[in-house]
Amino acid sequence: MLPDIEICRATPLAPIDTIAQKAGLHANEYESHGQHKAKVSLHCLERLANKPKGKFILVTAITPTPLGEGKTVTTIGLAQGLAKLNHSVMACIRQPSMGPIFGVKGGAAGGGYSQVAPMEELNLHLTGDIHAVTAAHNLAAAAIDARIYHEQRLGYADFERRTGMPALRIDPKQVIWKRVMDHNDRALRMVTVGRNEPGKNINGYEREDGFDISAASELMAILALASDLRDLRRRIGNVVLAYDLDGNPVTTEDLKVAGAMAVSMKEAIEPTLMQTLEGVPTLIHAGPFANIAHGNSSIIADEIATRLADYTVTEGGFGSDMGFEKACNIKAKASGKTPDCAVIVATLRGLKANSGLYDLRPGQAVPDALFAPDSAALQAGFANLKWHIDNVNQYGVPAVVAINRFPQDCAEELEQLVKLIEALPNRVSVAISEGFAKGGEGTKLLAEKVVEQCQHPTKFTPLYDSGIPLDEKLKAVAVKGYGAAEIALSDKAAQQLAKLQTQGFDHLAVCLAKTPLSISTDPAIKGAPRDFIVPIRELRLCAGAEFVYALCGSVMTMPGLPEKPSFMALDIDQHGNIVGLS
């Protein structure tokens, strides 16, 4: 098969006007950005307000290998399969971060004959939404240090007299707003800002700081969770940046930077319209990671798509313990929209990897041995798929297992896996998906199974009620969402929890950040572990996103580059064509 980028370039694409019309948008409801992408105006929702919503399908997966198991391929392939069955359909996916593109995982446009196109435009910058988030985030960071500098330079009374503004008296040791950038750079995890030459302070006041990747910014979560421009502005104004010398929260509104941050993101709130290789309209919007953020595309994109199409296919990052959990307990709470069907993507290689018999590590190629017949490893790793099926079932959402087929897969093992699934006591539909090799033709059976499941009523049940205390919410996700025995708060996290509860933040949701490579917080533990401890080392307040962010185990909010990063394969030829992007 040709490389993804060559398949994409060899496929004729429709003008974006044609795709917009196919989706049901009017000419004044979108603005073209080149030939193959457009920004969709939120004004279209005024026209569509009384139109019934279509079915909402959420694609999730087993616990993945470091290179992923084809969730985006399946999302796009399923959308194309539904179109082959003459259904009105749209797909919604996240905007890829350049961190993984240049790091380990490569692009995030799907692959083979189930891609969003042009894939190089999607993977590299798109319409600049991530850059807008980065700029707005770092504006707040600059505003904090500027305010500390001027208040301390002048003294609080003189500052108030000269500016007519109250002194915020920010405690430099309690600034909780880091800086961000859209690259993997471990050297920036811990930095010192405001350093000066001896005897000078023109660069500000020295303090410890750090960088997160832009996908982990609270503003990225806000972009994905806001319902409209007014809600975006409200949420940005609620962001807590620091605490003052008395321990009171200091918000963006206090700093009078919230309006400028919202202005920086005024175009980012509009989803970007593109197309699959088979012309299915696709909305790309927001890019929070699922391991260190809430891992789903935007509520706004879902709202537009479900008003326009009979079926909307979207995905939650990583396994069902990650993006799916957060879709059900964070996103659904904000949107009021719950899935009509879940698709659980499984692969032979992924299940064998979950047997614990193979050593797969980020940054290393998948060993060929993983594709060789190994019935014992498949049987052992099947426990992971069963866990994810049971996990989805507890939310009351009908499920279909999509076995994403690789060219190297053994036909006998595929048959063995289908039989294992069909023998489960809680009957679940299953289909082999060949979207990568065959596009929509390879996912028609999967599409039929999904349509059938969408007819069944859901009994959606989140893991916790919003009225219970934060510590009980954390425990609910760990125990019911992961199968843990208990959570273990570090001394720092326990102090932070007490402070958050005292300040009235018990009503917020919780977002646990952990490794995606295990259901537990230890990436080395494969399969379906139970009764483990979830160590929570730190809690971060995201008052604008309306959740408390719990850092579990050793997870980092700024990734690092591997020994052999993906960027080494990237180049550009004399005609401006990008080479080496996958």
UniProtKB/Swiss-Prot annotation:
Disulfide bonds: none annotated. GO terms for biological process: tetrahydrofolate interconversion. Pathway: One-carbon metabolism; tetrahydrofolate interconversion. ATP binds at T65, P66, L67, G68, E69, G70, K71, T72. Keywords: ATP-binding, Ligase, Nucleotide-binding, One-carbon metabolism. It catalyses: (6S)-5,6,7,8-tetrahydrofolate + formate + ATP = (6R)-10-formyltetrahydrofolate + ADP + phosphate. SUPFAM superfamilies: P-loop containing nucleoside triphosphate hydrolases (SSF52540). Gene3D superfamilies: Domain 2, N(10)-formyltetrahydrofolate synthetase, Formyltetrahydrofolate synthetase, domain 3, P-loop containing nucleotide triphosphate hydrolases. Belongs to the formate--tetrahydrofolate ligase family. NCBIfam families: PRK13505.1, PRK13506.1. This is Formate--tetrahydrofolate ligase. It comes from Vibrio cholerae serotype O1 (strain ATCC 39315 / El Tor Inaba N16961). The gene is fhs.
